């Protein structure tokens, strides 16, 4: 079935910044998607087109991206009469219209909005849930479907928070749960225990939450943060059932070839900055002491040597985000250099659904894991919840069990699990190889 209308408008994300919403209309109705945006963005990412007019929205307007959908993409899609179910053809047409390697002409935010809305329209035409349509597009096995382990960002540092803590995200992963719904209950209980402990130790205001719903107390070191989380896990009664994951976002504190764990202090002492090897030693100590199962972006996005050296004997999942930015060329290099063994999949880093699916497949082919991810500037759109089930990746990170833009995805996964019943299993401790379950 052909598309009868494509329309974009500017709406707001969870940080109050403008973002692009796209509606695609077919005979079956109108289908809508909203594009997220990140705070710590990799230099190799597809371009999110912002207006740059400082007199409106502090330069963050998306009126150009919206116009690109309404004035360029919409007429081209309608005149090409592309079948809404032919995702590859839709995406290829937009990439040709754009013609740049990083989508800088039309904007990844314009292209992705259309790409996701088209997938929703196609699922409706096929009369199947979105996750089933995405599984069809990816060629994923659906016997059984796999529900992901939620990696819940319960404590924030780095660029997402004040305080001196350099590492950006401390996540809990309820790998010992029997189902997704049990995992979310466990995660929620630990989160509440963590908030109480944080207020007791750091004062009432320390319980306030950051962009992704995690607490952001004035913590100085990773050990202090991890001790607090371990205490919360114990208080909730889930020791041994809940693991921990880190997103270090190290590109944010990489300076002159060294890592500055005091990067938020303008007078930071450069004699205390760490080499890649010294930072690797710090991670190894943390892995030995705490139940850490996954480390994302342990080193800067172009510090390939440090990545490859660390991966050899890390013993935990090493997730590439800024290193690969969901970009097929960067993923191929990371695979060849043996720099990591999991991809963080953010659809807006590459900017189209077809390319996102290909990135996941390339990763699976190299026996990598894939973790589907939200962005810090999120919306009520639940697309990635269906995507993680459709791609069968077994792991998702979408913030804390707090703030509606985070819960939207987690609640959608609860619905999917309920709908699938015995046709689905929970990834649990096998999250890294969920595509093979």
From Swiss-Prot:
Sites where the protein binds Mg(2+): 247, 296, 321
Provide the E.C. number(s) assigned to this enzyme.
4.2.1.11
Annotated GO biological process:
glycolytic process
What do the Gene Ontology cellular component annotations say?
A: phosphopyruvate hydratase complex
What cofactors does this protein use?
Answer: Mg(2+)
Q: Where is the active site?
A: 212 (proton donor), 346 (proton acceptor)
Protein residues bound to substrate: 160, 169, 296, 321, 373-376, 397
> What cystine linkages occur within this chain?
none
One GO MF annotation is: magnesium ion binding
Q: Which HAMAP family match?
A: Enolase
- Quote the subunit structure annotation: Homodimer.
- Known NCBIfam families for this protein? eno
Task: Write down what this protein is called.
Answer: Enolase
Name of the gene encoding the protein in the UniProt record: ENO
């Amino acid at each position: 079935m052909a598309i009868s209308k494509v329309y974009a408008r500017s709406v707001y994300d969870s940080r109050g910044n403008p973002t692009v919403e796209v509606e695609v209309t077919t005979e079956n109705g109108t289908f809508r998607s909203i594009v997220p945006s990140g705070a710590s963005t990799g230099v190799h990412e597809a371009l999110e087109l912002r207006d740059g007019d400082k007199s409106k929205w502090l330069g963050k307007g998306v009126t150009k991206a919206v116009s690109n959908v309404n004035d360029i993409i919409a007429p081209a899609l309608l005149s090409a009469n592309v079948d809404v179910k032919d995702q590859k053809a839709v995406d290829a047409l937009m990439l040709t219209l754009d013609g740049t390697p990083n989508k800088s002409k039309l904007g990844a935010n314009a292209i992705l909005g259309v790409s996701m809305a088209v997938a929703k329209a196609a699922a409706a035409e096929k009369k199947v849930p979105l996750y089933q349509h995405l599984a069809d597009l990816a060629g994923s096995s659906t016997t059984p479907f796999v529900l992901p382990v939620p990696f819940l960002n319960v404590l924030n540092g780095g660029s997402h928070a004040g305080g001196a803590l350099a590492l950006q995200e401390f996540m809990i992963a309820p790998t010992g749960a029997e189902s997704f719904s049990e995992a979310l209950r466990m995660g929620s209980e630990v989160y509440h225990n963590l908030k109480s402990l944080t207020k007791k130790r750091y004062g009432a205001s320390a319980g306030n939450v950051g962009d992704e719903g995690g607490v952001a107390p004035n913590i100085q070191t990773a050990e202090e943060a991890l001790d607090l989380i371990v205490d919360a896990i114990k208080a909730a009664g889930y020791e041994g059932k809940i693991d921990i994951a880190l997103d270090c976002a190290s590109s944010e504190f990489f300076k002159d070839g060294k890592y500055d764990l005091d990067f938020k202090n303008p007078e930071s002492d450069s004699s205390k900055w760490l080499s890649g090897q010294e930072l690797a030693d710090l991670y190894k100590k943390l892995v030995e002491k705490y139940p850490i199962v996954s480390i994302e972006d342990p080193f800067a996005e172009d510090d390939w040597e440090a990545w490859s050296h660390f991966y050899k004997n890390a013993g935990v999942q090493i997730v590439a985000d800024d290193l690969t930015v969901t970009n097929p060329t960067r993923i191929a290099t990371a695979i060849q250099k043996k720099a990591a063994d999991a991809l963080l999949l953010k659809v807006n880093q590459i900017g189209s659904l077809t390319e996102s699916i290909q990135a996941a497949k390339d990763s699976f082919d190299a026996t990598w894991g894939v973790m589907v991810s939200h962005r810090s500037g999120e919306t009520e759109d639940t697309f990635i919840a269906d995507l993680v089930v459709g791609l069968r990746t077994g792991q998702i990170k979408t913030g804390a069990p707090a703030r509606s833009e985070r819960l939207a995805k987690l609640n959608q996964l609860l619905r999917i699990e309920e709908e699938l019943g015995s046709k689905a299993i929970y990834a649990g401790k096998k999250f890294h190889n969920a595509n093979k379950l």
